[in-house]
Amino acid sequence: MDAVQVVGDGQMECTRVGVLVGGGSLGFGDEAMPMKVMRAKDLDVMVCGEITEWTLCAYVNDASQLGKRRAMIVIGHERTEEWGMKHMATWLAPLVPGVPVSFLNAKEPFWYV
């Protein structure tokens, strides 16, 4: 992502961080799942790929207004999966000798104004 989105207090002290890559932060059919994980694991910050803005942003903003340490960093779907896909190419190549394996950067699909 050519920009990083942040919700919550960017200056707060952070002790616990969770990561949901790609579409995992959409909740796998349960859009409340990221909030449930933040509460259950007592996470200060959730680093996300892609989000449902009307739920996760509202939760983080509401929690911050109530004095809880909560923030979210949204990096983008492709960018959060990129690290794993680079590793996948390295991991897969020895398993398929003779077959060319390489990482192709999907790049940021959006352009910004």
Residue ranges and their predicted role:
Residues 1-113:
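Active-site catalytic microenvironments in core metabolic enzymes, especially phosphate/sugar-handling
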